[in-house]
Amino acid sequence: MPLALPITQRPLAGTYALFVVAVLGFASGLPLALTGQALQAWLSTEGVDIATIGFLSLVGLPYTFKFLWAPLMDRFELWPALGRRRGWLVLTQLALAGGLWLLAATPPRGALQVFALLAVGIAFLSASQDVVIDAYRTDLLAPAQRGLGASLNVLGYRLAMILSGGVALIWTDAVQGSGWSWPQVYRLMAAIMAGAAVLSAVALPRLLPPPPLPGDGLASTPLPSARNDLLGFLAVVAAVVVGYLTTLHAFTPVAQALLGPWLRGSTLSAALQSRWVDLLALLMGLAFTLPLAAWAARRARFETLLRGLGSYFSQPGAAVFLLFIVLYKLGDAFAGALLTPFLLKAMAFSSAEVGLVNKVIGLWLTLGGALLGGLLMLRLGLWRALMLFGLLQAASNIGFWWLAAQGKGSLPGLMIPAFDWGVVSLTQATPVDGGLLMVIAVENLSGGMGTAAFLAFLMSLTQQRFTATQFAMLSAFASVGRVWVGPLAGVLAESIGWPRFFIVSTVLALPALGLLWAMRSTVQRLDATPGAPLDD
């Protein structure tokens, strides 16, 4: 896709595009950590129980449904001077800054429901930002750049998570760190997001309008009216509200009746029994709400959504690819769903130690894994990279089982001396557990490689006319594991213990690899012709 740059800059356009992708990855990763592991660390320090923290991972629900409003971001242009993508970027980033500032002013213990609603709002804005960033990145990069571009995106993304996850944990350690409060951290992150909005407005290149796809019958079809788009979106929102109310008032009693005999004979606490009921009701509600929302979109003639998704689903094998997208990161997501509470509460590591190892050292290894994964993809190809990196991801979960079973001090550790780098400092030397360091190193290195290959796979499935809608749908399905396993993970960890929990996470990584083996020829053809129609 050509860049709308002055002609004298076009020889540098390819390098600049890759730089832009890394910067956008940073903007994407910052709020994700603040509604994920950083939020879990805040709740852990406030004394919230593991099962409740697991259910609060549902604040990330907007990530799984962002394809519902992605068509509006594909359809409407806010400010012609900024262009379609940059206009939405500036709006979402400014709103994120405001949302983070409000969250910092809300105590989680005293106003947990308000706190959760604000976190959902931040996740909605973050997911909306991701819709634009994913589409912008896919439009910006040529097919040959997508492997390296995916690696650079992970680089920026993980750097942001080092800041909002790792450095933030060191800041909040009262003994070894800076002794900041979590509200102070979130106010600083709000200021950074405001700065990102300024950069989006002045530094990002503007893309030229996409040309019609050759032979695309949709290219000559008039765009649906703005009225239909808005009414269609409102119809989908109404369906989701109906689904929520039905889950609350109908499916919860049904779940109680179904699980009652088993729960009465169990040794689980009353609170944990209630969580199992909530979990079953949640799954039933999801099975009801998604078809209802699809029906509402069709009845309301939400054509921008239906055409974008129809273009993808009209291709042979599309449903199988979606199943693979859900499964590929499932085991990794299950193991990592409550990793921060596991390390802080179950293993009793200090905030500074977790911040240094899991978020700083570990994320640098993830960056190395992402860059190594991008380079290996040039030689391995997409299918072999997905298979190899998927096997490594599954194997890395065994390390957490070992850590939970053996406990602290199983391997010799090391001492991190005190330092002051201005942005972050340690007031005294901090011991680092050797077992923790080894497990985090393996997990982050393999996870970075797997993420790079997975992003390249997602970009290969989209068609440019519907980039935002299709990529939002695909990445939303990819986030199903990360968001939806949280409630199950919290309940399961308290029910069967952490060692068995991590064995389950390893087993959950295997179905995707079997499916990938069955799809070998299809993925290889997709790698040869990115963006081409899928085949059986």
Residue ranges and their predicted role:
Residues 1-15, 105-114, 143-324, 516-536:
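Intracellular loop-helix junctions on the cytosolic face of multi-pass helical membrane proteins
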Residues 10-45, 238, 314-335, 441, ...:
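Pair of pore-lining "gating" transmembrane helices in MFS-fold secondary transporters
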Residues 36-52, 251-270, 328, 337-355:
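Short amphipathic helix-loop junctions that connect adjacent transmembrane helices
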Residues 50-51, 143-152, 351-355, 464-474:
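Loop-to-transmembrane helix entry/capping segments in MFS-fold secondary transporters
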Residues 65-82, 368-388, 403, 407-408, ...:
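Helix-to-loop junctions at the C-terminal end of transmembrane segments
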Residues 89-109, 391-429:
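C-terminal ends and interior cores of transmembrane alpha-helices
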Residues 127-141, 339, 449-463:
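Intracellular juxtamembrane helix-capping segments at the cytosolic ends
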Residues 363, 461-495:
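A late C-terminal transmembrane helix in Major Facilitator Superfamily
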